[in-house]
């Protein structure tokens, strides 16, 4: 029985940082987070000296943080076959317990782009997924959704899933692991090729043990 909730994600709100972002791809500024492949996620924070990497307005459209002052941004899908996909990965406070259920939740907001996805994914692993020289990671994953397309650009949307641990998992990776995605077109009159993608802001990631699947509820 779970006696109390404990978020196993370190720096779950991306507030702990080693500096303020000044350019794209500076995900390493968010402490405890890294990229498992050739992708370069973006870190946005209120403290950025440039408008492009602030929060409310930035190079990807912008959003006020769900909490605190910072969040991550990842490119999850695109129509440019030569471009890569972005993921964020972290190690957990402690390994997962075999057969324990875990509630996985995070908040997403769609950036300025033409397409949206129906879900994102989470992968738990015993060892880190790192230095993968691939543009897209295809792995079995835990779907994270709220039952509708993730197309809201005005506010944060909570998405979730329940994971039954194999035991010993120490790492969490977030992104798009689907081999064949189903796109949702959210714009139809934009000819800018940079918008032919699905780009998501991510904030407030939680992994908490629960006794039952019904114990994993959406958060405001």
Please identify what each model-predicted range represents:
Residues 127-130:
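Short loop/turn segments immediately following beta-strands, especially the blade-tip
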Residues 6-98, 107-108, 115-120, 132-219:
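Aromatic (Trp/Tyr/Phe) and Gly/Pro-enriched flexible surface segments
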């Amino acid at each position: 029985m779970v006696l109390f909730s404990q978020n196993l994600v370190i720096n779950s709100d991306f507030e702990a940082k080693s500096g303020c972002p000044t350019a794209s791809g500076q995900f390493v500024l968010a402490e405890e987070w890294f990229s498992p492949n050739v992708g370069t996620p973006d870190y946005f924070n209120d403290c950025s000296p440039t408008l492009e990497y602030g929060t409310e307005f930035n190079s990807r459209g912008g959003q006020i943080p769900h909490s605190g002052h910072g969040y991550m941004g990842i490119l999850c899908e695109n129509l440019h076959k030569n471009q890569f996909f972005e993921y964020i990965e972290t190690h957990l406070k402690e390994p997962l317990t075999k057969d324990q259920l875990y509630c996985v939740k995070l908040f997403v907001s769609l950036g300025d782009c033409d397409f949206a996805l129906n879900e994102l994914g989470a992968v738990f692993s015993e060892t880190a997924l790192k230095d993968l020289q691939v543009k897209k990671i295809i792995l079995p994953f835990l779907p994270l959704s709220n039952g509708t397309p993730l197309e809201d650009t005005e506010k944060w949307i909570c998405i979730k899933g329940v994971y039954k641990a194999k035991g010993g998992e120490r790492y969490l990776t977030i992104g798009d692991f689907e081999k064949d995605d189903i796109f949702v077109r959210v714009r139809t009159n934009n000819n800018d090729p940079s918008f032919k993608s699905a780009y998501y802001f991510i904030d407030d990631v939680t992994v908490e043990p629960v006794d039952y699947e019904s114990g994993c509820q959406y958060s405001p």
